[in-house]
């Protein structure tokens, strides 16, 4: 009974169905009841928002100053061209940022295959349509900036950088960047059974990417990210700084000073030393009667002692608990 309460079932990979190069369906079971939605939702959020990728962020088109323009001889308006450029599936090797160029003249459809790039860039969807030239004299020339990032970053989130460098952005058309290579991720939880238990979960994940990242690799990365984020909880410990209590002295510092600091007359000082009264704390605990019993200490010396103590807001007959303190050594 104890093992069934404290031990959890470990799911196994039941099936990987490769629907296409960019589309995969993965089934995991058995999972404890409720764990299907827990893991499925966590993986879905990470896959859609945290997978790194490359996206078009800026475009310069010859003769175009803003996105609300049209270009003679081009069927699409500029906004539509920018939306088409957002659909490029680009893989870059060894760099975080690259520039691509596109120059096309004459009647015909302009596709991703017409983009000029180096050996460190791979465009997956070469047949992706960018625009259409409708006459012999029509031409289009553009410079495309591609950057690495994560998730979805709208232009408005970059306004601070742009406002600080306005002169550098003249003629540049900014594009909302969709970096995520994961285009679709859905999951469903079905019933699973192990021996007599029928309340278990089966997690079915179906995912599509744009081709720049293998679907199975995407799930492995998402699981690794989730595992790394949770690792701190495995080794959870109290890292709060201990509260340092300010230690208040148990006794007034003046009580720890020797009686010589009272600058009594030689007669009075010698009488106190003869009675082994070395510290002011020793002295203030004595009563007048006790001091008058001290040999050679008369009323004149007693009056002197009382006056000196009064000047320091002290008096005879005081009760000091835990006296003497540990840091005082008897002379």
Swiss-Prot record:
<protein>
    <recommendedName>
        <fullName>DNA-directed RNA polymerase subunit alpha</fullName>
        <ecNumber>2.7.7.6</ecNumber>
    </recommendedName>
</protein>
<dbReference type="GO" id="GO:0006351">
    <property type="term" value="P:DNA-templated transcription"/>
</dbReference>
<dbReference type="GO" id="GO:0003899">
    <property type="term" value="F:DNA-directed RNA polymerase activity"/>
</dbReference>
<keyword id="KW-0808">Transferase</keyword>
<comment type="similarity">
    <text>Belongs to the RNA polymerase alpha chain family.</text>
</comment>
<dbReference type="InterPro" id="IPR036643">
    <property type="entry name" value="RNApol_insert_sf"/>
</dbReference>
<dbReference type="InterPro" id="IPR036603">
    <property type="entry name" value="RBP11-like"/>
</dbReference>
<feature type="region of interest" description="Alpha C-terminal domain (alpha-CTD)">
    <location>
        <begin position="251"/>
        <end position="331"/>
    </location>
</feature>
<dbReference type="GO" id="GO:0003677">
    <property type="term" value="F:DNA binding"/>
</dbReference>
<dbReference type="GO" id="GO:0046983">
    <property type="term" value="F:protein dimerization activity"/>
</dbReference>
<dbReference type="Pfam" id="PF01000">
    <property type="entry name" value="RNA_pol_A_bac"/>
</dbReference>
<dbReference type="GO" id="GO:0000428">
    <property type="term" value="C:DNA-directed RNA polymerase complex"/>
</dbReference>
<feature type="region of interest" description="Alpha N-terminal domain (alpha-NTD)">
    <location>
        <begin position="1"/>
        <end position="237"/>
    </location>
</feature>
<comment type="subunit">
    <text>Homodimer. The RNAP catalytic core consists of 2 alpha, 1 beta, 1 beta' and 1 omega subunit. When a sigma factor is associated with the core the holoenzyme is formed, which can initiate transcription.</text>
</comment>
<dbReference type="InterPro" id="IPR011262">
    <property type="entry name" value="DNA-dir_RNA_pol_insert"/>
</dbReference>
<keyword id="KW-0548">Nucleotidyltransferase</keyword>
<dbReference type="Pfam" id="PF03118">
    <property type="entry name" value="RNA_pol_A_CTD"/>
</dbReference>
<dbReference type="InterPro" id="IPR011773">
    <property type="entry name" value="DNA-dir_RpoA"/>
</dbReference>
<dbReference type="Pfam" id="PF01193">
    <property type="entry name" value="RNA_pol_L"/>
</dbReference>
<comment type="function">
    <text>DNA-dependent RNA polymerase catalyzes the transcription of DNA into RNA using the four ribonucleoside triphosphates as substrates.</text>
</comment>
<keyword id="KW-0804">Transcription</keyword>
<keyword id="KW-0240">DNA-directed RNA polymerase</keyword>
<dbReference type="InterPro" id="IPR011260">
    <property type="entry name" value="RNAP_asu_C"/>
</dbReference>
<dbReference type="InterPro" id="IPR011263">
    <property type="entry name" value="DNA-dir_RNA_pol_RpoA/D/Rpb3"/>
</dbReference>
<dbReference type="GO" id="GO:0005737">
    <property type="term" value="C:cytoplasm"/>
</dbReference>
């Amino acid at each position: 009974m104890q093992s069934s309460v404290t031990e959890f079932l470990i799911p196994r990979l039941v099936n990987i169905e490769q629907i296409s190069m960019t589309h995969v369906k993965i089934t995991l079971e058995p999972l404890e009841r409720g764990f299907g939605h827990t893991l499925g939702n966590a993986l879905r959020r990470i896959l859609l928002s945290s997978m790194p990728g490359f996206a078009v962020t800026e475009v310069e088109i010859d003769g175009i100053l803003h996105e609300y323009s049209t270009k003679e001889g081009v069927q699409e308006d500029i906004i539509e061209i920018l939306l088409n450029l957002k659909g490029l599936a680009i893989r870059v090797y060894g760099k975080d940022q690259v520039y691509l160029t596109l120059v096309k003249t004459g009647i015909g459809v302009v596709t991703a295959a017409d983009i000029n790039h180096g050996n460190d860039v791979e465009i997956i969807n070469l047949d992706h349509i960018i625009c259409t030239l409708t006459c012999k004299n029509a031409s289009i020339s553009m410079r495309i900036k591609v950057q690495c990032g994560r998730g979805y970053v709208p232009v408005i989130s970059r306004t601070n950088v742009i406002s600080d460098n306005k002169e550098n952005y003249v003629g540049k058309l900014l594009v909302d960047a969709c970096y995520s290579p994961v285009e679709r991720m859905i999951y469903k939880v079905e019933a699973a059974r192990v021996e007599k238990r029928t309340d278990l979960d089966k997690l079915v994940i179906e995912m599509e990417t744009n081709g720049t990242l293998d679907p199975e690799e995407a799930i492995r990365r998402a699981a690794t990210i989730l595992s790394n984020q949770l690792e701190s909880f495995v080794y959870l410990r109290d890292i709060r700084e201990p509260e340092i209590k300010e230690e208040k002295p148990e006794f007034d510092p003046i009580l720890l000073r020797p009686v010589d600091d009272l600058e009594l007359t030689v007669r009075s000082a010698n009488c106190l030393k003869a009675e082994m009264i070395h510290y002011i704390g020793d002295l203030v605990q004595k009563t007048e009667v006790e001091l008058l019993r001290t040999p050679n200490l008369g009323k004149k010396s007693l009056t002197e002692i009382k006056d000196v103590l009064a000047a320091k807001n002290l008096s005879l007959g005081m009760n000091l608990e835990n006296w003497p303190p540990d840091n005082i050594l008897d002379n």
